[in-house]
């Protein structure tokens, strides 16, 4: 499978993923790009699961973003609804992690759109390892979101045999509002 991690902190939201594509117990490719910028660079998306399935869902999600003028939540709900009700899409096995300047979501084939606690997402075979590492770093360091994603992916790759050390990391910066 893979590992995808997303962290939001101090005016940055970051999604990173490894590059391993496996077929059974064989590594087929080590430098796949599983994290992408969508909607003119305003939305980040990462996927875990079957590569062909995930690319199909990514294309559908991008179409939903266009149809909903970049509204991440509406696009996510529309994709989840279509994914759940369309007979062909229901067979696709993948998870999407998506984020914009305001929100982050996990979209599943069961029709779930989940806004994670603490704006931390970790999916895929190494997701639990990456989530544990990222959570510890969020709670105990002042590292940037990008540094946390890099370290979480590295730790997951050291533990999970379906996660490698080739990382794609996308950073979306946004202004932070300081209370007066």
UniProtKB/Swiss-Prot annotation:
According to its UniProt record, the EC number is: 3.4.25.2
Q: Which keywords belong to this entry? A: Allosteric enzyme, Cytoplasm, Hydrolase, Metal-binding, Protease, Sodium, Threonine protease
**Which superkingdom is the protein from?**
Bacteria
Species, as recorded: Tolumonas auensis (strain DSM 9187 / NBRC 110442 / TA 4)
Q: Which GO terms describe its biological process?
A: proteolysis involved in protein catabolic process
Q: Main EC class of this protein?
A: hydrolase
The subunit field of the Swiss-Prot or TrEMBL record says: A double ring-shaped homohexamer of HslV is capped on each side by a ring-shaped HslU homohexamer. The assembly of the HslU/HslV complex is dependent on binding of ATP.
Location comes to: Cytoplasm
Return the protein name.
ATP-dependent protease subunit HslV
Entry-linked InterPro entries: ATP-dep_Prtase_HsIV_su (IPR022281), Ntn_hydrolases_N (IPR029055), Proteasome_sua/b (IPR001353), Proteasome_suB-type (IPR023333)
| One of the record's GO cellular component terms | proteasome core complex
Q: Which family does it belong to?
A: Belongs to the peptidase T1B family. HslV subfamily.
Q: What does this protein do?
A: Protease subunit of a proteasome-like degradation complex believed to be a general protein degrading machinery.
Concerning Gene3D superfamilies, the annotation shows:
Glutamine Phosphoribosylpyrophosphate, subunit 1, domain 1
Residues annotated as binding Na(+): 157, 160, 163
CDD domains this protein is in? protease_HslV
Main subcellular localisation: cytoplasm
Select a single GO molecular function from the record's annotations and give it.
threonine-type endopeptidase activity
């Amino acid at each position: 499978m893979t590992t995808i991690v997303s962290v939001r902190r101090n005016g940055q939201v970051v999604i990173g993923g490894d590059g391993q594509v496996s077929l059974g117990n064989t590594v087929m490719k080590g430098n796949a790009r599983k994290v992408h910028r969508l909607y003119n660079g305003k939305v980040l998306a990462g996927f875990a699961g079957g590569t062909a399935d995930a690319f199909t869902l990514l294309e559908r999600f991008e179409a939903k973003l266009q149809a909903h003028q970049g509204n991440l939540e509406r696009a996510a709900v529309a994709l989840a609804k279509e994914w759940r009700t369309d007979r062909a899409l229901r067979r696709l096995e993948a998870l999407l992690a998506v984020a914009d300047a305001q929100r982050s979501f996990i979209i599943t084939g069961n029709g779930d759109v989940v806004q994670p606690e603490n704006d931390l997402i970790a999916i895929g075979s190494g997701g639990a390892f990456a989530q544990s590492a990222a959570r510890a770093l969020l709670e105990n360091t002042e590292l940037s979101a990008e540094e946390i994603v890099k370290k979480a992916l590295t730790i997951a790759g050291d533990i999970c045999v379906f996660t490698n050390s080739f990382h794609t990391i996308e950073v979306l910066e946004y202004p932070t509002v300081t209370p007066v």
